[in-house]
């Protein structure tokens, strides 16, 4: 498997893990289809994700790969906007967040990151 293919496979597997973790806690969660420049995130939590619809950008960086909180949260914001626009929803009803895999740890040890301004309507 090429490096690019292995990275994509690791990312897809992590998205499934995240979706299944939320489902096991009775959240309505789905993986979202890739849409290129109009991508809408990796996983959607349909209701009551800290009072909103959650759009999750899932990241599973490999060993030696940098963690880019600023870039990833910006990506989540853009994709949340795409999700809202495609469905005619107010952006205020969407909470963009990033889920980052903790290497060598269980899914419950992943990190959930969002901007304070996104949570508190900055």
Stretches with model-predicted labels:
Residues 1-122:
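Catalytic phosphate/metal-binding cores of nucleic-acid and nucleotide-processing enzymes, i.e., regions
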């Amino acid at each position: 498997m090429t490096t690019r293919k292995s990275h994509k496979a690791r990312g897809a597997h992590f998205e499934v893990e995240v979706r299944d973790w939320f489902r096991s806690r009775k959240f309505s969660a789905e993986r979202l289809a890739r849409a290129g420049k109009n991508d809408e995130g990796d996983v959607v939590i349909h209701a009551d994700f800290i009072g909103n619809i959650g759009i999750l950008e899932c990241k599973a960086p490999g060993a030696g790969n940098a963690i880019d909180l600023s870039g990833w949260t910006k990506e989540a914001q853009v994709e949340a906007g795409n999700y809202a626009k495609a469905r005619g929803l107010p952006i205020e009803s969407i909470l963009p967040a990033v889920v980052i895999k903790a290497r060598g740890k269980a899914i419950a040890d992943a990190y959930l990151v969002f901007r304070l301004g996104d949570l508190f309507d900055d």
